[in-house]
From Swiss-Prot:
Claim: Transferase is one of the keywords in the record: no
NCBIfam families xref list: L-LDH-NAD (TIGR01771)
Sites where the protein binds NAD(+): 29-57, 98, 137
Binding site residues for substrate: R105, N137, R168, T247
A Pfam family the protein falls into: Ldh_1_N
Function text: Interconverts simultaneously and stereospecifically pyruvate and lactate with concomitant interconversion of NADH and NAD(+).
Name of encoding gene: ldha
Compartmental location: Cytoplasm
Principal place of residence: cytoplasm
Protein name: L-lactate dehydrogenase A chain
Length: 331
């Protein structure tokens, strides 16, 4: 008899039980790993699968996490074969070429489209009912690409979008007002990145509109220069990349925030990238961030945001920029 047989007496043969809340992270780079650890520490799933083409790096990261299993309640698996991702509830795609210092997100695009042509069909093959969350940049275009390549309905393909931009915005407003970011309600919509749109008309604390107190807020004529906060949001990622080489922690926490709303069916409103054709005067088939309700089925509703004419014009300009790139893509 083996030690195990001496220790444990078997009562019944276990039926294989599928995971109830499996999450897959595709890509074990800095963003993938920050997303993975954020999901694990929030205890969001009973199984976390990780997949990447870089076999040694993947194996090392998975082992490193598995060595912490005692401190977690999640089974951790990893393989370069996509069968490891089978029956995932949410698949988070972080894989792709990394943005170089000074490189615009749009510049990355065709490099990443080619990577997606391999990734997306594999995800669909093993998790045909999953919710697909795209994080790789440029996120709005790649969410459109994932939607086209997957054949999924639009409510099951979501881009992480401006969830992080809005978090940065709220943090910086909080710093200026000496308040916690959760008490500063503020939204950034449109493109994740350089042409994002701050909705100054909606910024409020405890229901008090800040533009009501300072009608010049967010304009050139504002003596308090609130506009600089949006510039800091846009420049924030570039600044972090310049200082440490990449961004990871905040986007990882932002991803876990979105996964939580889906897995726990919270019906929370998040600014995420979705098909906005027909909204805010957008005519083309583009994905941009607007406030959306996330739950167990994916993106269930879109909030009709009241935008000022100038804000709406900026969203339309974003859409035109993205469509200009999208129509050149070879899918």
């Amino acid at each position: 008899m083996s030690t195990k047989e001496k220790l444990i007496s078997h009562v019944m043969k276990e039926e294989p039980v599928g995971s109830r809340s499996k999450v897959t992270v595709v890509g074990v780079g800095m963003v993938g790993m920050a997303s993975a650890i954020s999901i694990l520490l929030k205890d969001l799933c009973d199984e976390l699968a990780m997949v990447d083409v870089m076999e040694d790096k993947l194996k090392g990261e998975v082992m490193d996490l598995q060595h912490g299993s005692l401190f977690l309640k999640t089974k951790i698996v990893g393989d370069k074969d996509y069968s490891v991702t089978a029956n995932s509830k949410v698949v988070v795609v972080t894989a792709g070429a990394r943005q170089q210092e000074g490189e615009s997100r749009l510049n990355l695009v065709q490099r990443n489209v080619n990577i997606f042509k391999f990734i997306i069909p594999n995800i669909v093959k093993y998790s045909p009912n999953c919710i697909l969350m795209v994080v790789s940049n440029p996120v709005d275009i790649l969410t459109y690409v994932a939607w086209k390549l997957s054949g999924f309905p639009r409510h099951r393909v979501i881009g992480s979008g401006t969830n992080l931009d809005s978090a940065r915005f709220r943090h910086l407003i909080g710093e200026k007002l000496h308040l916690h970011p959760s008490s500063c309600h503020a939204w950034i919509v449109g493109e994740h990145g350089d042409s994002s749109v701050p909705v100054w008309s909606g910024v409020n604390v405890a229901g008090v509109s800040l533009q009501g107190l300072n009608p010049q807020m967010g304009t050139e004529g504002d003596g308090e220069n609130w506009k600089a906060i949006h510039k800091e949001v846009v420049d924030g990622a570039y600044e972090v990349i310049k200082l440490k080489g990449y961004t990871s922690w905040a986007i990882g926490m932002s991803v876990a925030d979105l996964v939580e709303s889906i897995i726990k069916n919270m019906h929370k409103v998040h600014p995420v990238s979705t098909l906005v054709q027909g909204m805010h005067g957008v005519k083309d088939e583009v994905f941009l961030s607007v406030p959306c309700v996330l739950g167990n089925s994916g993106l269930t509703d879109v909030i009709h945001m009241t935008l000022k004419a100038e804000e709406e014009k900026q969203v339309q300009k974003s859409a035109e920029t993205l469509w200009g790139v999208q129509k050149e893509l070879t899918l």
